């Protein structure tokens, strides 16, 4: 299966002396499009240059600075269009809820436990007689999970939860949250 695309070739040709100023070097650009299966050789450029001399009144000469600027801009545009990367921020923006997200938990509905720092383990001091020993036990705040339900959005992840506490089951929801029976992401 052959792709039908064409390649553009640009050939600088000397500018006519009456079009260019004596202090400026000008270059005339001839662009020719040919398909992939057809080769581009110098014979084609000679025959096409004859046709350009016939239509010389229609063409305009371009300075080298303008030509280089156009080449740089075109190549930068082609490079930027050929590679499309999805950044982590834009991918995260696609997953967000349409109404925004909670500022405290960033829309996840859960925050790290402030007592254990998200590890789920708590350093407890065990004092026996003359020596003190630190033991790691289950965190009494998050019960070893390392996460707590966000107290601002109450686990919804939404920035505005007006009326949530007016619902009939809100009292049970708050009681579960304060006693640690309400799990994040549930």
Swiss-Prot record:
Its cofactor is Zn(2+). This is Protein PHOTOSYSTEM I ASSEMBLY 2, chloroplastic. Gene3D superfamilies: Heat shock protein DnaJ, cysteine-rich domain. Residues 1-22, 35-60 are annotated as: Disordered. Interacts in vitro with LTO1. A zinc finger (CR-type) spans 81-162. Zn(2+) 1 binds at residues 102, 105, 150, 153. CXXCXGXG motif repeats lie at residues 102-109, 113-120, 139-146, 150-157. The gene is PSA2. Keywords: Chloroplast, Metal-binding, Plastid, Repeat, Thylakoid, Transit peptide, Zinc, Zinc-finger. GO terms for biological process: megagametogenesis; photosystem I assembly; thylakoid membrane organization. Residues 1-75 form a transit peptide. Disruption phenotype: Embryonic lethality due to female gametophyte development arrest at two-nuclear stage. Seedling lethality when homozygous. Pale green leaf, variegated leaf and slow growing phenotype when grown on MS medium supplemented with sucrose. Expressed in leaves and flowers. Expressed at low levels in siliques.
């Amino acid at each position: 299966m052959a792709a039908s695309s064409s390649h553009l070739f640009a050939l600088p040709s000397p500018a006519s002396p009456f079009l260019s100023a004596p202090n400026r070097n000008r270059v005339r650009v001839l662009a020719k499009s040919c398909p992939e299966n057809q080769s581009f050789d110098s014979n084609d450029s000679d025959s096409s240059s004859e046709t350009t001399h016939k239509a010389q009144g229609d063409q305009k000469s371009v300075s080298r600075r303008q030509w280089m600027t156009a080449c740089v801009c075109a190549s930068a545009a082609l490079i930027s269009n050929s590679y499309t990367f999805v950044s982590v921020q834009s991918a995260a923006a696609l997953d967000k809820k349409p109404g925004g997200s909670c500022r405290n938990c960033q829309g996840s509905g859960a925050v790290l436990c402030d007592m254990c720092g998200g590890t789920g383990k708590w350093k407890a001091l065990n004092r026996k007689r003359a020596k003190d020993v630190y033991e790691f036990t289950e965190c009494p705040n998050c019960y070893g999970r390392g996460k707590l339900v966000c107290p601002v959005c109450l686990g919804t992840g939404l920035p505005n939860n007006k009326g949530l506490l007016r619902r009939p089951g809100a009292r049970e929801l708050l009681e579960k949250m304060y006693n640690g029976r309400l799990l994040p992401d549930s």
